[in-house]
């Protein structure tokens, strides 16, 4: 099965169903599956006519209908799409364009200031298409998306179907530690993941897409899986506008990372008890939201219970870019709070020294031009996830830490900091916490929840006293080696990657971030 087959089947089934909705200022615009497919085909044929068959083509931009049409135009033909993080600085984007050997680029209008730098510093880059219909005063080698599509419309030849083992896309990991790696995913990797994920939606089901589109989680679960079921993908134009856009698009389903769920809950919890939960849910969620799928970090089951009070079911899953990306997920029919669900039917799971190992049709081909890193991650056909976990008697998977984050104390005891962090984070005064290993034991580095600090008018000494009292209670229930012996109260939030994960290598830096 190829992504092209999945998309063509969707157009046959759902041709006049609305595929995409988005905001243009205050107006909601929309396109049907048939309309989207026309642009996908003209893009694909245009790329073939321009000689980009078998080439790597980068995309830089936030979620837009032009972005997804261009991406699908690339991967349904015989080229490889390289979606890049639009939030990265110019010099890092230049590095990734060059490291991925990209010879063409689709670029959002917001990134036009980077254009000269790309042309000057990316020697393999032959052509750039701006992700807008009409553009003026473009330098040599730069065109509008309409010019490429017009060429495709007039071209007689269409690209042949790609091979199932051809590289469809190269997705760069966030690089929270060390150099980011380009994950090579084949046509079969993506298609098998789309088919194996057990999510059912009726045609026209509204899905509000709020995650960055270059993420494998967003790209595969929102767009490819959503399109396979005839869903209507609604584009969130900004995280700042997410709650407003929920009331506009009235989604049935959403994908979120835990941090978003926690942020929304704070808004719910801040409302007075006199407001009925049904009224509050209508105001915050838009009135139709039934399910939130989440992954990417630990979510405390507390939030699952709280959201259920508002009629919203939260289902956790587990995955990584290297697995296209989903490995396991909870479903509306089969779920267990605290778990990350049962493994998909197309993957095998085993454990080696507590580490989760994965094998299956969704597992990547390797890291682009990084043979040593590929060999280290893929051993005897098994992908070493770097996550520690276990499976219960009902077949549900649980994670309890990262292998590389393991703290080895001087007495030889091993501690997974995430297990402790998840417990400490339950305190309302704790906004962010990282546990580090020091010479004298474990230290909790905590950034206080500013809303609580302000509401209770806490000064620095009061914050320290309350947190220390909380740690004292925690320590009483723990063996000696798991007790917190040090407390550092931060003035600023931790530095995060563009995927909103705390960069553990930078936890000692406590400075305001731009």
Language model segments and positions:
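Gly/Ser/Thr-rich phosphate-binding loop
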Residues: 252-256, 264-335, 431
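AMP-binding/adenylate-forming catalytic core of the ANL superfamily
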Residues: 88, 105, 360, 366, ...
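Conserved pre-ATP/AMP-binding loop-to-beta segment of ANL
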Residues: 15-18, 130, 150-172, 179, ...
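Conserved AMP-binding/adenylation subdomain of ANL enzymes
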Residues: 191-206, 213-279, 283-288
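Conserved AMP-binding/adenylate-forming core of the ANL superfamily
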Residues: 20-64, 68-72, 89-94, 144-149, ...
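Conserved AMP-binding A3 loop
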Residues: 30-34, 168-194
